[in-house]
Amino acid sequence: MCSSDLAGLAAAQQLVRQGHGVTVFERDDRLGGILRYGIPDFKLEKRMIDRRLEQLEAEGVEFATGVEVGRDLSIDELKDGVDAVILATGAQRHRDLQLPGRELDGIHFAMPYLIQQNRRVAGLPVEGPEITAKGKRVAILGGGDTSADCLGNALREGAVEVHEIAHGPTPPGEREPLKTWPEWPVVMRTYAAHQEGGQREWQFVTDGFEGKDGRLTHLVGHRVEFPGYAETGVRKPVPAKGGEVLLEVDLVLLAIGFTGTEEDDVYVQSGAAIGERGTVEIDAGYATSTPGVFACGDAVRGADLVVTAIADGRQCGAAVHATLA
């Protein structure tokens, strides 16, 4: 099993309960993947992860931390002596912005910030250049779970002010009549972090960044309107009159999603086909294009919910068992 992330742990438990020997390789120093270093403690207490890991160990799952498959251990070495390899490494290739000033110091992807903050809370050393919101004016670009996680962390660190910025129209309080099931409901979502503070901004387009001596000082943007959106559901933004904005900031966190799996050596060595969405292609039995190599979770589906990854991991484990039986 490559990765102790959500889907990997679920698949491991499914297989060990069927009598298979399972070893999970994790590149980080501790187990849990995004549960450990991505989701903040105020949403998920780490003792809950540790309790599940203790259960898995008691059931017979073996773990190896600090081992990155593809670098510390090649796929060929891994396949030698095992019947199946499962890739469950997630989808953490960041979506970026190509805007003027993007290179300025003070602009970071959200996940490195969340990882560092999780390590701080756990009393662990922080790796790489420090990313902190303490005493800073923060802008978070994005409007989903990750941006809310950044907001909660920034407030807890003692940020001077925090803006969560989204370019889409202000969501309605109730589901739109034109957006019926199974389409994703476009409604106002207020997370616990939003109730703690910060300012939420919609209909705000970021145009670039300004700085001094290589350091970020301002976010440049403009406000937009969506004429007829409430009646038609069609998004056609037009600049709002007098809507230019120059926002004084010290830290910008990009929480605008992910574009697929990371371009790791494990995928190059495995030969597993990667589709147009940047995720691993599989058949109905979770098998990749390489015999003996399977994949599941966000590595296949793209960034998704915790419960979805767990369900996918269990289904993958059942499919691998059926193949090996």
Where are these regions (language model features)?
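FAD-site-proximal beta/loop scaffold in flavoenzymes
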Residues: 103-135, 228-303
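A conserved FAD-binding loop/helix module that cradles the flavin
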Residues: 147-151, 157, 296-324
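Short, small-residue-biased leader/transition segments that mark boundaries at the very start
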Residues: 2-3
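N-terminal Rossmann-like dinucleotide/flavin-binding domain of flavoprotein oxidoreductases
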Residues: 34-83, 185-205
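Rossmann-like NAD(P)H-binding beta-loop-alpha module
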Residues: 7-17, 123-159
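Short hydrophobic core segments
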Residues: 25, 81-90, 139-141, 206, ...
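Glycine-rich FAD pyrophosphate-binding loop
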Residues: 18-36, 161-172
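Conserved beta-strand-loop-beta-strand element in the redox core of flavoprotein oxidoreductases
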Residues: 65-85, 121-128, 211-245
